[in-house]
């Protein structure tokens, strides 16, 4: 397989019509019949909650999927690099750096 020049893949056809072409089938100006209508020319900024998404739309469960189905699992492995350097040389160097920092801080504070 040539990774620099992969074979072409045909994109699958869209399972639904484009979003912008649908017209609302409900009355928009007074969509809540129990409440009085808003002022003339008023349009709500966002429609109310319409329930669950239809099957086939993004984020909707498949039509024949059981309700008790587990969510998809993505396995993530976390690897930590830990130094196991317990030599005396390393301990001496750490002590020297600590003493140097303390001396510098003491000089700055006094």
UniProtKB/Swiss-Prot annotation:
The chain crosses the membrane at residues 87-104. This is Cysteine-rich and transmembrane domain-containing protein 1. The lineage of its organism: Eukaryota, Metazoa, Chordata, Craniata, Vertebrata. Belongs to the CYSTM1 family. Residues 1-18 have a biased composition (Pro residues). GO terms for cellular component: membrane. PANTHER family: CYSTEINE-RICH AND TRANSMEMBRANE DOMAIN-CONTAINING PROTEIN 1 (PTHR47564:SF1). The keyword Secreted does not apply. The keyword ATP-binding does not apply. Residues 1-45 are annotated as: Disordered. Residues 19-29 have a biased composition (Low complexity). It is found in: Membrane. Keywords: Membrane, Transmembrane, Transmembrane helix. InterPro entries: CYSTM1-like. It is a single-pass membrane protein. Its main location: membrane. Coiled coil: none annotated. Signal peptide: none annotated.
């Amino acid at each position: 397989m040539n990774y620099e020049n992969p074979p072409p893949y045909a994109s699958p056809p869209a399972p639904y019509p484009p979003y912008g072409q649908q017209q609302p089938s409900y009355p928009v100006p007074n969509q809540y019949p129990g409440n009085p209508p808003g002022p003339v020319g008023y349009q709500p900024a966002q429609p109310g909650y319409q329930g669950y998404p239809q099957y086939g739309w993004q984020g909707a469960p498949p039509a024949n999927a059981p309700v008790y189905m587990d969510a998809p699992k993505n396995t993530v492995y976390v690897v930590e690099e830990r130094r196991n350097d317990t030599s005396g040389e390393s301990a001496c160097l750490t002590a020297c750096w600590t003493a140097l920092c303390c001396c510098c801080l003491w000089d700055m504070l006094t």
